[in-house]
């Protein structure tokens, strides 16, 4: 019972941390210095990656198995709050599924 409680609390803490990172991701146009140094400074980059992932998922549903090279393949590192950068559209514990 104690182990289950500890696991549930740990899961809730991790989920809260992810939501905090997502909310403070630095997309504030008034203060671009909040963004991390390695992050792309183009504000449209997320929309573009989302469009690529959507197009690739549509192509896969239609049987056109030609995923774009612009998305991350399976077992690649990804950002938890941007799963659309993965070709599969799923980012699990910072790895594309």
UniProtKB/Swiss-Prot annotation:
UniProt-annotated location(s): Secreted
Entry coiled-coil feature ranges: none
Region described as Disordered: 23-46
Keyword field: Cleavage on pair of basic residues, Disulfide bond, Ion channel impairing toxin, Knottin, Neurotoxin, Secreted, Signal, Toxin
Tissue specificity annotation: Expressed by the venom duct.
GO CC annotations on file: extracellular region
Signal peptide: 1-22
A GO molecular-function descriptor: toxin activity
Pro-peptide region(s): 23-68
Paired cysteines (S-S): 71-87, 78-91, 86-96
Main localization (coarse): secreted
Domain remark from Swiss-Prot or TrEMBL: The presence of a 'disulfide through disulfide knot' structurally defines this protein as a knottin.
Described function: Probable neurotoxin with unknown target. Possibly targets ion channels.
Annotated family: Belongs to the conotoxin O1 superfamily.
Protein's recorded name: Conotoxin Cal6.1a
Species, as recorded: Californiconus californicus (California cone)
């Amino acid at each position: 019972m104690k182990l289950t409680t500890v696991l549930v609390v740990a899961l809730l803490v991790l989920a809260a941390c992810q939501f905090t990172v997502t909310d403070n991701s630095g997309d504030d146009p008034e203060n671009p210095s909040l963004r991390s140094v390695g992050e792309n400074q183009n504000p449209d980059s997320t929309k573009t990656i989302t469009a690529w992932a959507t197009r690739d998922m549509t192509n896969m549903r239609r049987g056109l198995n030609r995923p774009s090279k612009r998305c991350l393949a399976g077992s690649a590192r990804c950002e938890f709050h941007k799963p659309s950068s993965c070709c599969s559209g799923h980012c699990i514990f910072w790895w594309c599924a």
